[in-house]
Every structure is written in C-alpha cells, then in structure tokens.
Amino acid sequence: GYALAEAAQARGAEVLLVSGPTALTPPAGVELCPVTTAEEMRKAVISRFSWSDTVIMAAAVADFRPTQPAAQKLKKRRSPVTSLELSPTDDILRELGERRTTQVLVGFAAETEDLLAHAREKLQAKGVDLLVANDVTAAGSGFGSDTNRVFILDRDGRAEELPLLPKREVADRILDRVLTLPTGRRSTKPAAGTGTHRKE
C-alpha cells in the first residue's frame, strides 16, 4: 500500500492512505489516516468513498475478530484460555463493490495455494475492476519483502504475470493498468494505498 501511495502521489494524485499499524513512514505529500481495527478501516474508507475516483484495497484485513475482546492482557495463570470464539469481520471490498458508481476499484488477494483460481473467484465475488494476486509463500514475495511477484487480473479474464520486481515498480505497473480502463471507470489521476483519491 505504501509503494502504491508513493507512486500515485508522484503522478500527481491526491492520495489518502488508510493504514493499520506499521513501522513504515508515509510518503511525503500523502495524507495518512491511521486505524487499528478492521471496523475502523471500514468506517474510514466508506466515509470517503463517495468523493473518491480510485480505491486500491491493498491491506490484508483480518477475516475474523474475537467475539469478546479482553480489556487487558490475559494471564496464563489467572485465566487460562481454553477456546477462542471468533466472528467474521465486515467484507470492506465487497461493500465497496456494491456501493460504487463510477469509482475504479482494485483489490488484492494474498494466497497460499491455487492462486489464480482463488483470485478469479474473488474478482467476480467482490465486483472489482482489477485484482492483484500474489503467492505469499513464494521467495521474495508478499509481506515483509521489498519485492513482489504478482498477477494482475481484469474483468475480461486476462491475467498478466509480472516477474519478481521491486514493490515500487509493481505499484507503477498496477497504476499503468488502472489507466487502461475505459473513461468513466477510472480517474485521470489514480490514487492508491488502502485509500482513496478525492474527486476534483
């Protein structure tokens, strides 16, 4: 997300980066909206969606959350945990797909197996224009790496495979694809991050 925000800002986009906790420094000129939970991220993105041209959901949002979060750290001796009940978090990307009008929507899929099959299924289910998929178990790819190897899938069923590249270069390739979308389905200035771009 940070590489995308930097690349979009360098192209002249007005970028809002909605980010969970990280040690990364926001790119210069990018507005940061920090969040800590999936619900906070949902509220931040949904509240700004109407004035956005392009939304790129690059964050790996947790699929589940504890049903009853503890107010403080649980001590093993005082209250041993024998089970943990989980509830599904809201599907932010699907909600954006249902709400959108002319916005461009780009999703990400971090997979560990059957990469393209799962990515194509997610692209259709979420209603996005592009889906960026990567195998997070592959060497040099995924979280905590400065490089990534991805597929970029579109709604016509095409899947472009990118070689292992620096994440900033991957970000530029993704933005290049955004600019190939038909007028009216994209902004002339793409935005990025798990974030938004204000309409002018």
Where are these regions (language model features)?
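Short, glycine/serine-rich, charged loops/turns that create anion-binding
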Residues: 22, 112, 157
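Glycine-rich phosphate/diphosphate-binding loop of Rossmann-like nucleotide-binding domains
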Residues: 1-37
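Structural signal for hydrophobic packing residues in well-ordered secondary-structure cores
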Residues: 22, 45, 49-53, 178, ...
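Structural motif
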Residues: 14-16, 31-32, 53-55, 103-107, ...
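Glycine-rich phosphate-binding loop
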Residues: 37-136, 140
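Catalytic-loop motifs flanking and including active-site residues across diverse enzymes
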Residues: 1, 88, 92, 170
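Glycine-rich phosphate/adenylate-binding loop
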Residues: 100-102, 115-200
